[in-house]
């Protein structure tokens, strides 16, 4: 599947409804942080984390926490001030640590 063809729904179908809610929340944080960003190919930057999340969910089969961390990573990367605005307990320490660790290598 081409990165430009990937939808959030293609990712969500791999998870249970309660898991989907957290993925959607983290996706919307990333979408907001990336709304004005475009890639070198002039496509919306949100395509990149969608592509990574698709690989994580559909090809590797990692748990929903990893998918949420992919989107949270991009949200924090482009808007570091967002982390303190997220309600306490919304994301587990595991998800936050994965996202912050990804920021170290991005």
What label would you give each PLM region?
Residues 1-106:
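Active-site helical microenvironments for divalent-metal-assisted chemistry
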């Amino acid at each position: 599947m081409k990165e430009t063809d990937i939808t959030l729904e293609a990712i969500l179908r791999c998870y249970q409804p309660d898991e989907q809610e957290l993925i959607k929340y983290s996706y919307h944080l990333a979408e907001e942080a990336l709304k004005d960003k475009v890639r070198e190919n002039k496509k919306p930057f949100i395509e990149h984390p969608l592509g990574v999340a698709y690989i994580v969910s559909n090809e590797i089969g990692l748990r929903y926490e990893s998918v949420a961390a992919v989107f949270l990573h991009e949200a924090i990367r482009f808007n570091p001030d967002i982390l303190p605005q997220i309600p306490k307990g919304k994301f587990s320490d595991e998800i936050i640590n994965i996202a912050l660790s990804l920021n170290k290598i991005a």
